Amino acid sequence: MRKLIETASSKVNTTQVAGKSHAHESAQRQVSGQARYVDDMPEPANCHHAAVGLSQVTSGRITHIDLSEVRNSAGVIDVITVDDVPGHIDIGPVFKGDPILANKEILFHGQPIFAVLATSVNLARQAVLKAKIDIDPTEACLTVSQAKAQESFVRPPHFMRKGDFAVQYAQSLHQLSGELKIGGQEHMYLEGQVSLAIPEEQDRMLVYTSSQHPSEVQKLIAEVLDIKLHKVVVDMRRMGGGFGGKETQAAQWACLAALLASRNQVAVKLRLPRMQDMQATGKRHPFENRYEVGFDKLGVIQATHVEINGNCGHSPDLSDAIVDRAMFHCDNTYYLGDSYIEGHRCRTNQVSHTAYRGFGGPQGMIVAEAMLDAIARKLGEDPLTVRLRNLYDDQQRNTTPYGMVVEHNLTKDILDKLTTSSDYWARRDAIKTFNATSPIIKKGLALTPVKFGISFTAQHLNQAGALLHVYTDGSMQINHGGTEMGQGLHTKIGQIVANEFGVPLGWIEVTSTRTDKVPNTSPTAASSGTDLNGKAAQNACITIKQRLAELYAQQFNADPTTVEFAGQQVNCGDNSIAFVDLIQQAYFARISLSSTGFYKTPKIYYDRATGQGRPFFYFAYGASCAEVSVDTLTGEYKVERVDILHDVGNSINPAIDVGQIEGGFIQGMGWLTSEELLWDGKGKLISNNPATYKIPAIGDTPEIFNVALYPRANDEDSIYHSKAVGEPPFMLANSVWCALKDAISSLSDYHIDPDLSIPATPEKVYWALSKIQSQLAQDGNK
């Protein structure tokens, strides 16, 4: 059951378009198969295809490479290794450590060693199999525990301190400690990694790619080819999903395609088959976290120590910022008292793990929920009661471990409203009664909040540009630095532009993201797409509106600030003119109808040396109530009902926002339940295809799924006072994990906190049930 809100709050600054539910701009083309992705584009004449040879060893040194049979294979045009790279070998996005092709050392199973160019994709992939490569294996580091024992890290540790944890912990009436193993997650985008590189005259290169960060792809291609950035243009119309997996990890394949295209002066397409895609690209970071918490007789936290340990794989990639964000979010909505947070970036011989929706936030936030559950069961209280007692308030208990004051805190009101709308307390009583009389099926219930910080934690990335053209018939083209991966960014940008000028949405064309239109862009990540690019687009609109307003107002000796744009008309007092007619006047008056726009996020800063600052412009809030049923004989379970209340500020497009909330929740539920990454004892990923890696299916969707938007404008000056909606809903799924623990704990009358690692597969649920049953049996024999 789905609840859609057709219109936004009346406070939205809207005339016709913003604040209303409009279909995704590509929806009809996508469902009819007409939307073009990179692999759907008509191939240029004489287009060739590339394939990549991957290491079958996890750690070692290459002693000999024989590619003669590869070169002699049918249809092969070129074969390259790292020795054929004219420019930079290392394509690490921030810190070094990511060779475009293996450079003597093998760092993980599935590492690209060479690339082949052939006349067809099948011939290229067949040729790859003929390589003979000798590798001298070395001992691999496969776990966080091994990395810590070997002091193997990709970056230095980071610390946040508030007060004196040791003193307060020692003085606390109650003390608890625990640890939580948290699995990674495959992005499983429907469109895999793909790039098409087309060489042009004068060493120029045009690249079509499926990337969240075209400017980074442009930069790395230029460095690999040893040319200037202005020689490379990257075009990105749409992705078939990204989720962070195409923020940095798309660049390698684009660079290889461009290198082969440059060497052979032919168009080159490189598309990874699904199994290779899963082997060679990074995942959500697995974490192994530990906590110590001291609290009083009511369960109010007095002191907290959290140790965050991220499995980063073989190189830094974005791990520094990802572990930082896990640290920033290990408080969630709770005041941790005197706190000590430490974060470690562990190096292992796995693929370099990377960005994924939430960017470390989920792996940190789930620790807070684990702590609150443990406290509640220690005291025999309902977990919701303990959660409410520990919320940040608006007085003294309102400062995070990193020194940011939690302003405009909506958590308490959202929890109160959802507690009522979900009928939490009545259902809690009913579930206790049910469990008391049901020997096999046990039900669980949990209501958990979310507080998620919005901004890139790397300050310089919080900027965006746009380019707007108004044509003489009143239609417009807007280009911006954000990328469309199905989340509806282009739709919202189109709504913003249409709203600013008071014209229909159909008059606005949002063009493909291109590095020759808006330069030096930030990735579309950190839930910032609409916040940054929407403001930049609005800025471009305001510039042209000011020009038009001055032209029209001077005809009546009026103040240009009194001119309004609405309903395809431009009004100045009692005077009115059709928007198209004013555009014609501006053209004949030689007034520019083109403008750039720019925006940078205000107020944010963070001092890593002190671990203090304001890394986020604002917080997005939400809460979720989940009910599950668990079969205690098998560990199988079903999510029966979910109720969500989520804060999106003044929604620009309620239908898209609800869709993002639903999708984010289900994806988060998959991470917490069925999506298990498995490596064998030698470091090979064995859950490397859709048959062995289980994302949620339609049947896993809760039968009752209520989603509502919290109706309150953002207090900060975001675009139309809306809020980001990309990442925060992912963590609403924490309620499912907590509900599973609630059902398991019912075996002990809610006194034992289950040991349930993530993902909570049916096997792990069964083991957790068995552990409690064994403990109860032992206690009964004493």
Set out the residue ranges of the language-model regions:
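Glycine-centered tight turns that cap/initiate beta-strands
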Residues: G75-D78, K231, L298, W507
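C-terminal catalytic domains of large/alpha subunits in multi-subunit enzymes
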Residues: V82-V85, D226-K231, A261-L270, I322-I441, ...
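Flexible, low-hydrophobicity surface segments
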Residues: M1-P156, Q175, R263
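Glycine-rich loop/linker segments at domain edges
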Residues: K20, S26-G33, F159-S195, P286-M371, ...
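Thiamine diphosphate
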Residues: G240-Q265, K269-R271, L489-V497
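Short acidic, glycine/serine/threonine-rich loops at helix termini
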Residues: I89-V94, A127-K130, T209, Q218-L220, ...
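Conserved beta-alpha junction segments in alpha/beta enzyme cores
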Residues: F165, Y169-L225, C312, D324, ...
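Short glycine-rich loop/turn motifs
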Residues: H48, N103, E191-L196, E288, ...
